[in-house]
Amino acid sequence: MHANWKTWAHVTKLDPDKRLPPGAAEEIATSGTDALMLSGTLNVTQENLNELLDQVSPYGLPLVVEPASPDCAIFDGRIDHLFVPSVVNANDVRWIVGKHYTWLRHANSIDWDMVVPEAYIVLNPNSAVGRVTGADCALSCRDVAAFVEVADRYFRFPIVYIEYSGRYGDPSIVQAASDAVEHAVLYYGGGIRSAEQAAEMGRIADTIVVGNAVYDEGIDVLRATVRAVQ
């Protein structure tokens, strides 16, 4: 039985390219977060992804892999879901559908019960994901709402993900996305480093994702962001 990702309020994102200090995996897994997402834009390999899985899988928390390339789209008995992103505001079609085609063209088999497609709207042009995908980040509230409607109502993505990637976002933009979404679960990620920021975005989005704070601020801040939304 796969974990019910639709009910999660707080997800912690861990980057396989970043090292966790000794004991950190257990502290993160027992912080109260609903799930762990293993995800990164640069320098993610099967080797460092599996190393991180080895660290976090013993604690029984739901695990998601979010692959940045077909090589890391793995089906592993330790993970619950594969969240596969399409950057819908990318200027390079490879990040919308091209890499997905490559993955399916060469895959031996796909466990579709594990796959959850995500419509990413990337809004930080200075982030790695913004640069790599060539995302058009200069979007108004109406622009974002239109992308949400395309993703949610036309393409029927089950997740719409507002991604500021390392920078705290504009609540009015996230509110516009929330107002536009009808069916999908709305995720927000980017720059959450305090309980106050977690609470603010948690009131708008269905699920908040906390990532860099784990490495930069430490476990106490992570726990505070969990308490703010649960």
What is each of the regions a protein language model found here?
Residues 38-43, 81-96, 164, 190-192, ...:
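Glycine-rich phosphate-binding active-site loops on the catalytic face of alpha/beta enzymes
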